[in-house]
Amino acid sequence: LIDALMPIERIKNIFTTLRPVAVIVDEKCQKQAAKLGMGQDVYDYEQIVQTSPDADKLQAVREKMIDADPVYALFTSGSTGVPKGTVLTHLSVMKYTQWYAETFHIDENTVFGSQTPFYFSMSVSTMFSTIYTGAKLVVIPKQLFSFPVKLIEFMNEARINTIYWVPSAMNMIANFKALDEHRLPFLKTVLFAGEAMPTKQLNYWRRHLSADTLYANLFGPTETTDIAAYYIIDRDFRDDEPIPIGHACRNCDVFVLKEDDTLAGADEEGELCVRGSFLASGYYDNPEKTGEVFVQNPLNTHYRDMIYKTGDMVKYNDRGELVYITRKDFQIKHQGYRIELGEIETAVSAVSRVYECACIYDLERKLIIIYCSGQNLTSKDILLGVRDRLPKYMLPNKMFFLENMPHNANGKIDKKMLQKIYENEMQK
């Protein structure tokens, strides 16, 4: 699936990589497909669904297919500006779907409330587990995520009992305190992934849903089908305490490597690495990029053993649970100290009246920048709120307050947009 709202040049880059022989479009996208002018056949979706399948041809395809064959490619942003197509196999999706359905008790009684678009890796979980178990999938209209009360009313009318959302979507309900007056009596499973879940907002949800509701923090990139590690919330957390990402999923092995490719010890930071049946085959028609992150396991010199280096910096806490720190490329050196921007975000998120926040770094001016939304906030509020949580060298140098934080198409806080907003601000 391709987002028709993407810039035409980005779509062309994807088509140049994939070189598809055919494209299926709905009526609204026919003109856009024609503009691509790349020679592929274009088929109308409405006509296809009314066409009887050719059973013999389908059977011939099934007989040739093996579980190592690709089932789809999901495109994510690339450092060169050209999207990378992550190739997943039938085996990866089947193993992952079985684990997901069994772990979170997905069955024919499950009613998913879908928040993420179908071209985002999180949709793999809900879409394929629905097919696998006979569950029901309800697509929540995007505009409702700007109106928390209407969103809750929609969820109750649809009797939604399971959600798997990005935290930004959950934050919106918590920040407006929508559950103070409106209940979600059917909701029994709350799963989240895609970005760090602010503990303050999670605690709000936990106070307002029934005591037997299951909450879980899921963690993993597109390159691991969707998830590689997870943590089912089983204890209370302070508002300024990060939620662990937990332990490896079944058929996954996760471990933490230091820069010298040795295992990180207790409380040592390192890069999260993944091996197992959830792994992607690599990036479509991009062997160079594939070879950079899908590599031989340095802990095993005896036979071929591929791992994926996620670029996520993590460590084990004193309970032996993995805790996410930041992206490898979000680490900075400031005043001689190595700093994780994610740690600053966690501290600011815990401040009273803060709804959402993001931290960026001005390398040229050596400044830590905070953007946040909230209720009647000032720079003094933020500094007073974090001074007992952060050392002086980690305190924000500049703070900007927005009515609403920008989000990308997947619902995450858009840090690239914040970087542009900041650069424009500095040019004034």
Language-model segments: residues:
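Generic structural signal for small/hydrophobic residues in well-ordered secondary structure
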Residues: 14, 70, 90, 100, ...
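Gly/Ser/Thr-rich phosphate-binding loop
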Residues: 132-135, 160-164, 174-244, 253
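AMP-dependent adenylate-forming
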Residues: 8, 23-63, 93, 214-217, ...
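ATP-dependent adenylate-forming carboxylate-activation enzymes
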Residues: 1-13, 27-30, 135-158, 164-172, ...
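Conserved AMP-binding/adenylation subdomain of ANL enzymes
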Residues: 84-113, 121-161
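Proline-aspartate-enriched helix->loop->beta-strand connector
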Residues: 19-20, 160
